[in-house]
């Protein structure tokens, strides 16, 4: 009876010994005090990677040395995120001057594998006129109502050291692999600065937390070696030539193992064989299906199966009556969110049988007509394109979305009709056309809106659009991602107030899940590059598109225009280059640029800075719609 038990024990111990040997870390440095020092960070020549040098002092504290003799204490280290947090310097006693001004602030050596993350919001204070002019032209927000003034008035340390100081700016740093400075402090420009990490601009200054600077490190490569003996601490590796650097050798993992840059080990490559990879990669999915997300996925699968069967019946030349039956079933689920189910007779009468004279617009989804109901109400009627299954499902999707929302800056769905050959939606009528039409001509009043639209109204349009999108992201459960934010989907009513429209491509998010994986759809020029490349739809995808709309409002230029120079076809690239070169005002729409007051110029620059943040290539570096709405509100208060 004991032999099987002994055999099992022996087998288990053998496995433990095997796996522990395959995951032995390579030269990790000893703890500094009570703080673990993960690979590749190095506190000595015989551990870690020497290129990732930090210091451990005699008191058990870690320090990060930067250029010009400056050094900052390390507060926390996140090895999985490959980042650590520094404590920035404070003020000199009773002066609005940073302690490290003689070192010119925190600047990194561009030859080392560190860079500043995009999580940092930097406030610079005590600026000269030259400093304000220079930084304002570089895209910093130096307006009278900017965030930095709230900090000066509410932060106890700043208020004590900078009493009477009114000149300041703020900006977001980082967001690229070549950002090597937090701020270059100079007495002839701005002599004090402070940094905060993951700052929520909507909360009071008193709740900002302690100052911090987040630094990223690049994933380390395999250790350098001269002979196989140098690889003895990295099991399952062999010293061989580095094909990317002639004359250099590295400890490369043997076949069947792969380099784990976080733990500095050669781990078993469980996906080296297709079957094995498939088996292991399914484990997280099976765990997820056990929860609420799994229920949603299962429901989606069932729905897709039903729809697929219906599509096959349609393909078999059966009548559209079966499609209408499917729609009727779907709509009955959401009927409590609709004001009314219209008859086919009512719709035909309201639109004069879809007369061309009532046609308001058309697109891939179908056509939109103006209609008049018997009670005198003017409505907009959207009809799916005949024979186009995709447009039908977009309309059904729009019903499912709009039945769940109600906001003054979102177009209101009044009802639907499923008696006609194609499904129809009925909306409130928004009489002043789209923002696109007004910017580029053909709008509600005939000529372009910009002949009489001042900067304040443009800011109000931006603010109301942001509020509508923020409602979708923050107040809906689950969140809703619009997926097609653009100037032609922003309607303007008789008071030029915003109604965000066209939810045919919108998607429901999943609570507590960072993104929805879906095929990239949207409009060229507005499409989030991360969404396009990775198929990960998030709230930040809408933020990117909104940033493009802000650029349109500022410049009166189209998102994509092949009449511009080849390198400037994309509006984001065009304006980003102007911001980087400090000449934003050169590309501002002359209608608001020429003759603008100093405060208006500051407001335009502040909006340009916000727009540039919204179109950051990395979604984590973009603000939320709530933060964007709050910042535009602050800009509005300044003019």
UniProtKB/Swiss-Prot annotation:
Its EC number is 2.7.11.-. It holds the Pfam family PK_Tyr_Ser-Thr. Residues 1-25 form the signal peptide. Residues 26-282 are extracellular. GO terms for molecular function: ATP binding; protein serine kinase activity; protein serine/threonine kinase activity. Keywords: ATP-binding, Glycoprotein, Kinase, Membrane, Nucleotide-binding, Serine/threonine-protein kinase, Signal, Transferase, Transmembrane, Transmembrane helix. Residues 304-639 are cytoplasmic. It is found in: Membrane. SUPFAM superfamilies: Protein kinase-like (PK-like) (SSF56112). ATP binds at residues 360-368, 382. GO terms for cellular component: membrane. The chain crosses the membrane at residues 283-303. Belongs to the protein kinase superfamily. Ser/Thr protein kinase family. It is an enzyme of class 2 (transferase). It is a single-pass type I membrane protein. Residues 354-639 form the Protein kinase domain. It comes from the Eukaryota. This is Wall-associated receptor kinase-like 15. Putative serine/threonine-protein kinase that may function as a signaling receptor of extracellular matrix component. It catalyses: L-seryl-[protein] + ATP = O-phospho-L-seryl-[protein] + ADP + H(+); L-threonyl-[protein] + ATP = O-phospho-L-threonyl-[protein] + ADP + H(+). Glycans are attached at residues 68, 115, 126, 141, 241. It comes from Arabidopsis thaliana. The active site is at 484 (proton acceptor).
């Amino acid at each position: 009876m004991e032999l099987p038990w002994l055999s099992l024990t022996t087998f288990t111990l053998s496995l433990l010994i095997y796996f522990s040997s395959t995951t032995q870390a390579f030269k990790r440095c000893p703890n500094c005090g009570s703080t673990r020092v993960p690979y590749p960070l190095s506190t000595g020549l015989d551990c870690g990677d020497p290129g990732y040098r930090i210091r451990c002092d005699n008191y058990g504290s870690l320090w990060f040395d930067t250029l010009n003799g400056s050094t900052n204490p390390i507060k926390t280290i996140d090895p999985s995120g490959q980042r650590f947090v520094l404590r920035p310097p404070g003020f000199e006693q009773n002066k609005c001057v940073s302690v490290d001004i003689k070192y010119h602030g925190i600047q990194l050596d561009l030859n080392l594998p560190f860079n500043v993350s995009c999580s940092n919001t930097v406030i610079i204070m005590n600026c000269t006129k030259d400093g304000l002019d220079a930084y304002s032209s570089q895209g910093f927000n130096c307006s009278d109502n900017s965030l930095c003034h709230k900090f000066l008035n509410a932060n106890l340390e700043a208020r004590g050291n900078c009493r009477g100081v009114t000149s300041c700016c703020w900006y977001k740093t980082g967001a690229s692999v070549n950002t090597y400075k937090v701020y270059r402090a100079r007495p002839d420009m701005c002599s004090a600065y402070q940094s905060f990490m993951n700052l929520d601009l909507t909360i009071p200054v008193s709740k900002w937390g302690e100052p911090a600077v987040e630094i990223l490190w690049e994933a380390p490569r395999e250790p350098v070696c001269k002979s196989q003996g140098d690889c003895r601490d990295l099991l399952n590796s062999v010293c061989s030539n580095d094909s990317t650097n002639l004359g250099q050798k590295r400890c490369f993992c043997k076949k069947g193992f792969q380099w784990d840059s976080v733990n500095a080990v050669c781990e078993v490559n469980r996906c080296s064989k297709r079957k094995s990879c498939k088996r292991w990669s399914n484990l997280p999915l099976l765990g997820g299906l056990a929860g609420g997300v799994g229920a949603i996925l299962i429901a989606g699968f069932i729905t897709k199966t039903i729809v697929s069967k219906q599509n096959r019946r349609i393909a078999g030349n059966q009548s559209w009556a079966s499609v209408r039956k499917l729609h009727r079933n779907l709509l009955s689920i959401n009927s409590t969110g609709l004001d009314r189910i219209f008859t086919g007779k009512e719709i035909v009468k309201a639109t004069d049988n879809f007369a061309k004279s009532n046609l308001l617009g058309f697109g891939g989804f179908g056509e939109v007509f103006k209609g008049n109901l018997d009670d005198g109400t003017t409505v907009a009627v959207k009809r799916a394109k005949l024979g186009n299954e995709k447009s039908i499902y977009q309309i059904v999707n729009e019903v499912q979305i709009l039945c769940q929302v109600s906001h003054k800056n979102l177009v209101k769905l009044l009802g639907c009709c499923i008696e006609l050959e194609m499904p129809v939606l009925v909306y409130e009528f928004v009489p002043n056309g789209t923002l696109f039409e007004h910017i580029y001509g053909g709008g509600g009043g005939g000529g372009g809106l910009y002949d009489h639209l001042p900067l304040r109204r443009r800011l109000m349009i931006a603010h109301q659009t942001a509020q509508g999108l923020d409602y979708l992201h923050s107040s809906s459960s689950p969140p809703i991602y619009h997926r097609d934010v653009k100037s032609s989907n922003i309607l303007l009513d008789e008071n030029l107030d915003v109604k965000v429209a066209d939810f045919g491509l919108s998607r429901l998010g999943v609570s507590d899940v960072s993104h929805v994986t879906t095929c990239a759809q949207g409009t060229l020029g507005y499409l989030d590059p991360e969404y396009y490349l990775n198929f990960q739809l998030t709230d930040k995808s809408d933020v990117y598109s909104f940033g493009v709309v802000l650029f349109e409002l500022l410049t009166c230029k189209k998102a994509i225009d092949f009449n511009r120079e080849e390198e400037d076809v994309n509006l984001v690239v065009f304006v980003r280059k102007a911001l980087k070169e400090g000449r934003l005002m050169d590309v501002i729409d002359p209608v608001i640029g020429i003759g603008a007051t100093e405060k208006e110029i500051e407001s335009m620059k502040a909006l340009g800075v916000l727009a540039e943040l919204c179109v950051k290539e990395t979604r984590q570096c973009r603000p939320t719609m709530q933060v964007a709405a709050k910042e535009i509100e602050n800009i509005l208060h300044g003019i």
